[in-house]
Amino acid sequence: MARGNPRKRAAAAKDKWKMKEWYIVYAPDFFGSKEIGLTPADDPEKVIGRVIETTLKDLTGDFTKGHVKLYFQVYDVKGQNAYTKFKGHTLARSYIRSLVRRRTTRVDGIFNITTKDGYKLRVMGMVIAYRRIQTSQERAIRKIIQDIIYKKAEELNFADFVLQSVNGQIASEIAKEARKIYPIKRAEVRKIKVLAEPSA
């Protein structure tokens, strides 16, 4: 089947690209409304719904937070500015692999929670113990992860829960309690996913 003149196709593609404009993408207010990237589109409606990935290091300048990946979704465009809401976060796989070594125990917990202001989230907590631990100790540590995450959800609104998760405050509380059961290497809130926002 004929494909047409390659030069014409290239020229058409070039013209289409020229028609696109660049939109500046901003993080939500609770991340300081900082610029997190640029995205091109020939229609502002096409920008809405796009998901932008960045890291906590890029937002804060803290070089120890390069492994914390953040995801923001565009929900509104005004002029050349695109505004986002937080969709989730995760830790880089390479970072998690660096924590999980031979003869350690990884304790995971996955919980569906509702924040004080009605956001429904799926939260994954993780504790790494220095040695192989007993099943009873593993259960006790998982219960600690669960109790602290649920307690924080009851106390905090969505923005504060997210910030305390990504900056390590909730993980520090988990680590403090888990060490009463067994010496641990690290505690993390390794993933958050927004399941639903409160109805208007």
Swiss-Prot record:
InterPro entries, alphabetized: Ribosomal_eS1, Ribosomal_eS1_arc, Ribosomal_eS1_CS
Keywords tagged on the record: Ribonucleoprotein, Ribosomal protein
Disulphide bond pairs: none
SMART domains referenced in this protein's UniProt entry, alphabetically: Ribosomal_S3Ae
Record-level Gene Ontology MF annotations: structural constituent of ribosome
GO biological process: translation
One annotated Gene Ontology cellular component of this protein: ribosome
Family note: Belongs to the eukaryotic ribosomal protein eS1 family.
Subunit annotation: Part of the 30S ribosomal subunit.
Protein name: Small ribosomal subunit protein eS1
Annotated source species: Thermococcus kodakarensis (strain ATCC BAA-918 / JCM 12380 / KOD1)
Organism ancestry: Archaea, Methanobacteriati, Methanobacteriota, Thermococci, Thermococcales
